[in-house]
Amino acid sequence: MRIAVLFFTIFFFMSQVLPAKGKFKEICERPNGSCRDFCLETEIHVGRCLNSRPCCLPLGHQPRIESTTPKKD
């Protein structure tokens, strides 16, 4: 009877394991990058992931660069 209870508890806890694909986000070679179907407006495309999706990096706080071209009057 002990063996039956042991097997029951083992099979019960094994059935509770969630699939890894749904819980973990695939990360591209960049530390802050993420694999998506399409990059958001606030992200840039920097390469491809292992599943051939684009690797997207957030832009963050980029300094605004003023144009050095002289203005025509």
UniProtKB/Swiss-Prot annotation:
Belongs to the beta-defensin family. This is Putative beta-defensin 108A. GO terms for cellular component: extracellular region. Has antibacterial activity. The keyword Signal applies. The lineage of its organism: Eukaryota, Metazoa, Chordata, Craniata, Vertebrata. GO terms for biological process: defense response to bacterium; innate immune response. The gene is DEFB108A. Residues 1-22 form the signal peptide. It is found in: Secreted. Keywords: Antibiotic, Antimicrobial, Defensin, Disulfide bond, Secreted, Signal. Disulfide bonds join 28-55, 35-49, 39-56.
